[in-house]
């Protein structure tokens, strides 16, 4: 007879599987995560370039959020297996941390950039929580994500133009405090206005001196060049 370990908590019970079985599942999960992360990175790379060129559609935003959420759900499954593995899960944990760096933050900032202004006045964190709770089948529907972002139902989301506020891109500028990012967005309302602003104009924003204004302009120019390069098909 096999030795079986069962954990009880209240009316719930959980049967611990053999370590080799759990480790195999975790490794398979990491392989799946690598594929999903690659797709997310691709969608994010497209969004990066489109935001600079001001050609983002609602579909671009929805797909990026869907892919980020899919990645995070796989992460949750692997994390539960890591907990069960204990010390045997250290290598898997290291692989996981290396793979997912920044995905959750990117998703939150995408939502913050595109969350529609409605009477409900939802926060990006609230939308993130709502996304994590919907069934997978609903997550794959563009209308579901659009509704959570505060947009109405459209026949073709690829034909609905939207603009970014700029939180996500601006957060990539080195030594850029979140309060300065907030001041920029509040002052200019959209990323395109920030992109078009000259050094003198940026200098007038609270917390930004001439040195930081130059850093912002230079960093944005370098990022734009890099994002275009990233999407060149060889």
Residue ranges and their predicted role:
Residues 35-51, 57-204, 210-234:
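Long, highly charged, low-complexity intrinsically disordered interaction regions
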Residues 2-3, 188:
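Short, well-ordered alpha-helix to beta-strand connector turns
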